[in-house]
Amino acid sequence: VTAGPLAGRIAVVAGATRGAGRGIAVALGAAGATVYCTGRSTRAGRSEMDRPETIEETAELVGAAGGRGVAMRCDHTLPEDVDGLRARLERDEGGRLDVLVNDVWGGDGLVEWGLPFWEQDLGAGLHAWRNGVESHLVTSHRLVPLMAARGRGLVIEVTDGDRDDYRGTLFYDLVKASVIRLAVAQAAELAGHGVTAVALTPGFLRSEAMLDHFGVTEERWRDGVAADPHFAISETPAYVGRAVAALAADPGVSRFAGRALSSWVLAREYGFTDADGSRPDWGRWFADVVQAGRDPEAVDPSRYR
C-alpha cells in the first residue's frame, strides 16, 4: 500500500459535519491525513441547523477513505471550546497541526433573501455573522499559534465566491466577503512565520441541503436541472475537497498566499476532477451565461464540465 501524499499530516476541518466541510475532510483522509472533524452536530444531539448529518459520520467516512478520522464536538464561536480542541492536539498530536480549514457557516435559515436589509431580522443577521465570521476568527486565534510555533502550515478559509460582486443580500455578502478578508489578513501576518493562508470557494455546491432543496438524491441529481438550469454545472463536495488536498500536498503553496481561489481554477492547476470524472467550471459558466444574461437552457452545459 502506497502512503498518501498527506500521510502523517494533521488537519482540523472546522465545520466538517456536512457540505464542503465533509467533502474536504474525506479528501484529506483519502490523501492519508489524520483529520479532526469538528462541529456541533453529533449523534448525541443536533445543532440549531437541525439536520441529520453528524461529525462522527464524517470521521467514519475519513477512515473509510484511508485516513484517520477523529470526531470532536466544538462550537467554534466559543473560545473555551476551541481551547479544548487545542489541548487535545497538544496532548494527542504533540501540538502538531499542518492544515486548518475554517469552514464553519451555520447561516442557512438565518439569511433572508428578497428583502432590503433594513426590513430583515437584525438578530438573525448578527447571528449569521457570529456563526460565519467570528467562528473563523476564534478558531484561527487559538490554533494558528500551533502552526507558527513550528514554522509551517496552511490555513484555508472557505467562502462563497472569489470576486467582489455583491452576493444579493447584505448579511450573507458581509459574511462571505469578510471570510476572504480574513484570509488576506492572516496571509499578511503569517508570511514571516512559514504559514500560508488562502480563501477557497466551491462553485454551485451539491451539498446535502441543496439536494434536499431540489428534492433529489445525488444519484438522480440531474432531475434538479428542470427547476434550475444552472444546477447542470453543480459540483459535489468532493471537488472542493480535492482542491484542499492538492493545496495541502503542494510544497509551493505559498505562491497562493492571500488569494481567493476556487475549485474550478485549482482543478485546472492540479488536474483533479469531480467524483464523476468531470471538471465543472462554474466561473466560466457564470461569466458566459449568468453575467452575459444568456438563456441557460440554450447553452450546452457539457461544454462547461
Could you tell me what each predicted segment is?
Residues 140-141, 184:
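A short, exposed helix-loop element centered on a Lys and neighboring polar residues
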Residues 106-110, 118-124, 128, 154-192, ...:
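Catalytic loop of short-chain dehydrogenase/reductase
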Residues 125, 132-140, 154, 164, ...:
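Conserved internal alpha-helix within the Rossmann fold of NAD(P)-dependent oxidoreductases
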Residues 9, 67-68, 95-97, 147-161, ...:
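Active-site loop of short-chain dehydrogenase/reductase
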Residues 50-51, 115, 192, 204-230, ...:
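A glycine/serine/threonine-rich, flexible loop-to-helix segment
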Residues 2-95, 105-118, 305:
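Short-chain dehydrogenase/reductase
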Residues 14, 97-110, 132, 156-159, ...:
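Rossmann-fold scaffold of SDR-type NAD(P)-dependent oxidoreductases
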Residues 134, 199, 219-305:
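C-terminal helical subdomain
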